[in-house]
Structure formats: structure tokens, C-alpha cells
Amino acid sequence: MKNEKRKSGIEPKVFFPLLIIVGILCWLTVRDLDAANVVINAVFSYVTNVWGWAFEWYMVVMLFSWFWLVFGPYAKKRLGDEKPEFSTASWIFMMFASCTSAAVLFWGSIEIYYYISTPPFGLEPNSTGAKEIGLAYSLFHWGPLPWATYSFLSVAFAYFFFVRKMDVIRPSSTLVPLVGEKHAKGLFSTIVDNFYLVALIFAMGTSLGLATPLVTECMQWLFGIPHTLQLDAIIITCWIILNAICVACGLQKGVRIASDVRSYLSFLMLGWVFIVSGASFIMNYFTDSVGMLLMHLPRMLFYTDAIGKGGFPQGWTVFYWAWWVIYAIQMSIFLARISRGRTVRELCFGMVMGLTASTWILWTVLGSNTLLLMDKNILNIPQLIEQHGVARAIIETWAALPLSTATMWGFFILCFIATVTLINACSYTLAMSTCREVRDGEEPPLLVRIGWSVLVGIIGIVLLALGGLKPIQTAIIAGGCPLFFVNIMVTLSFIKDAKVHWKDK
């Protein structure tokens, strides 16, 4: 019994270092917000200007690696002996659901404004050229390239799960073929896992930092409650308490139902925006943007603006590549888990086609709506951002639609549910990763899950206290640096092991 109890408890070598590192960083930030902002700006500038090229090359190499998987010797290899667990339609729907977080709703509604007001390639701000390239860049940042990267890592994790029958809850578990049993279970593995978990907890905190202002701004619009940092903190606290109640009372089925509601409501809300904002314009703008993407793709892939030094690729492309890198392992583990029984080619094609369609629909509909509101002078986005902040500007793009009250209620419910499910997923992932063995069908300890949800909430509040998008962007970029190397190691470990166990026939 003692042994069983010990096995299901926390794993000290990853739990305590993570807790200490995150605690110290939060304390130093809160202690002096002005000094923290200076450090944040310095870190952002250093990483994006000195190492931005590495992120761009990584994405390009992973794109070619995707083609190797799809057309290479492993294309017809099956990931597990069983038939696919889910139908193709359900599988794609689950992938779409994973794309409808509140953070995605945040960027989808406002990103195009930044691209138009500070465009790439030396274009004039707010010019026709800037508007033509605006959506094309969104399709680039949220299109086949990053999903190809995820599909490769998903194949790697599915291989370790279903072919090699490994119990993978942390990235170090996959590194035995690359570094050997001794290093994969020693100090090296502890360092790798802590890099992964520190980056992941800050990534989750940034998502919460993006989502919370949307909910509080909705509350201000609907109920007239002023949006303050204190209200943000109260909302985050309520989410944490709600998550704790769900976990303690065994209401995980309710959380899963809420996740399904989020997916259906996302379809409904996107369909509403598509119809009432101008379906014809949206389709024309999308078609034109795909052409712009294909025409400028080579330059977008390698654009660093080393001569012009306008800062666009550093502020956006490098930031988004770091965003994709930092979530890669968590998302790939989830996508691998739902892909049991599929071939390598099926998984790669299904992910790239299904997930690209999902993100392209989101960005096209929401971005086109924002552009139309700006062009028709219905909204003054720059003024809204300057006077009230980015979240208010996003809320106003939804409030400007017909049946504004019903629309805002729908958006409020969508953001609220998306954030509840985010915190639930955060606490579950972190608890699983910082505990010893948790057998199939078992849940990680309640107090550990609640503890991590509290810490994620604190990080979200700290980032909100710093103000603006730069702290959020810097947290992602700084976290993406160590995971950049972890992702490469997982990829190389898969390739090395597959050569032995998936011998060419």
C-alpha cells in the first residue's frame, strides 16, 4: 500500500524545481513592475533579433520533414495494431475543437489590424498593399507550416505510445533511444522536463492573460461593471474555484460536455459573423489572400528584415513560431492520443488539412469582419486600443454586428467556457507531468491539480498587471527557446528508434 501511495504522489525532481523557479520569477516581477518591463523588452529584443533566424529555419526544416513522412518509407506504417478509435469526421471535429480557445478568438479578431497598421516589406501603413498582405500573413502564421510541424511530433508521440508501448507523460520519456537509459532517467531528463514545464506553465499563463480581459470586457458591455485589474483577478479566482469544484466532485464529464458546447457554439458564432458581415467580401478577400500567400511564400519563410529593420518578422513571425514551438509537445501528445490506429500518412494529411481549414476559417471570418468595420469607419480601432485597450477593441468588433446583445451573450459564453476548459486542461497536464505514475483510468491528485491551477492563475494576473501585449509576447518567446531544443531532441529520438523498429520492407 505504501508503495502504491508513493507511486501516485508528486515527483520531487520536477515538482519542486518548477514550483521554485516559477515562484521566484513571479515574485521578482511583482516586486518591481517597471524594472520587469525593462527586462522584458531587453529579452524580447535579444531573442527575436539574435535568434529569430533559428526559429524560421526550424519551421522550414520541419516542413520538408513532413513531406518525408508523407511520401517516405514510413507513410503506410500504422500507429498501433487497432482500428482507428474515432471516425474520420469525429477525429477532425476534435481537432477543430482544440483550435477554438479564447486566445485564438483574441488574435483572430485583432491581428489583422496590427498587420495593416505596421505592415511588412516596407509597405505604407493602412495602404491597399498592406490590406492585401494582411490576411495572407495570418494564413501564413496559422496555416499548413505550423500544423506540418505538429503532425511530425504527433507521429513521434503516437509511435512511442502505440508502437513502442511507452508510458509517455513527459518529453524525457521519449529520449531513451537518443541519449540512453542512464541520461534519460538522470539529471539530463530532469533538466529537459523542467525546461518543458516552466515554458508550458508560462504559455498557459499567457493564454489566461489573453482570455481574461475578453470576459471582463464582455461583462462591462453586458452589465456595466467597470473593467479593472481587480475584476480580472476576481474572474480568474472564480474560474480556479469552479475548476476545483469540478475536479473534487467528479464533474469531469460536465467539463467534457462544456468543451463540446464550446465547439458547437464556435461554429454558430462564426457562421453568424460570416453571414451578417459580408459573405461575398469574405470569400473574395480569402481567395485573394491565398494568391498573395502563394506569391510571397518564399520571402515570408525567410523574412528577417535584416536591412530595413522594421521589426515585423521579429514581432510577429518569430513570436508566432515560438508560440507554436511552446505548445508543440502538449498539443502533439493530445493529437497523438486521438490518432491511434491511423497510418502515418493519414495522420499527417488529416492534421494539416483539417487543422489548416479550422484556423483559416477562424482567421478569415474574424479578420475580414474587423477590416470591414475599419474600412466603413464603423470602428476606430487605434483610438479604442489607445483609450481602452486591445480587449475592448476586440469586443467592439463583435458588438458592431446585428443583434448585438445576443451576439455579445454568445461571445461571452464562448470565452467563459473556453477559459474554464483551458484551466481544467492546464491543471490536468501539469499535475500529470509532475506526479509519479498515474495509471490508465486514474486521475492525478486533487491538491496537485488545484495547486497548479492557482499558479497558472497567478501568472495570468502578473502578466495582466504588467500591461500590454509585449509581456505576453516575451513570455512566449523566452519559453520557446528551451523547447526549441527539446522538440528537436524528441524528433531525432523518433527518427533513430524508427530506423530500428520500422525497418524498410
From Swiss-Prot:
Gene Ontology process terms (BP): 4-(trimethylammonio)butanoate transport; carnitine metabolic process
Pathway assigned in UniProt: Amine and polyamine metabolism; carnitine metabolism
Keyword Transmembrane helix part of the UniProt annotation: yes
Catalytic reaction list: 4-(trimethylamino)butanoate(in) + (R)-carnitine(out) = 4-(trimethylamino)butanoate(out) + (R)-carnitine(in)
Keywords: Antiport, Cell inner membrane, Cell membrane, Membrane, Transmembrane, Transmembrane helix, Transport
Keyword Transmembrane appears in the UniProt entry: yes
GO cellular component terms attached to this protein's record: plasma membrane
Membrane-protein topology: Multi-pass membrane protein
GO molecular function, one term: (R)-carnitine:4-(trimethylammonio)butanoate antiporter activity
InterPro entries, sorted: BCCT_CS, BCCT_transptr, BCCT_transptr_CaiT
Subcellular location as annotated: Cell inner membrane
Stretches that traverse the bilayer: 10-30, 51-71, 92-112, 143-163, 195-215, 231-251, 263-283, 316-336, 347-367, 403-423, 446-466, 475-495
Quaternary state and interactors: Homotrimer.
Function text: Catalyzes the exchange of L-carnitine for gamma-butyrobetaine.
Family: Belongs to the BCCT transporter (TC 2.A.15) family. CaiT subfamily.
Protein's name according to its UniProt entry: L-carnitine/gamma-butyrobetaine antiporter
Native species: Salmonella typhi
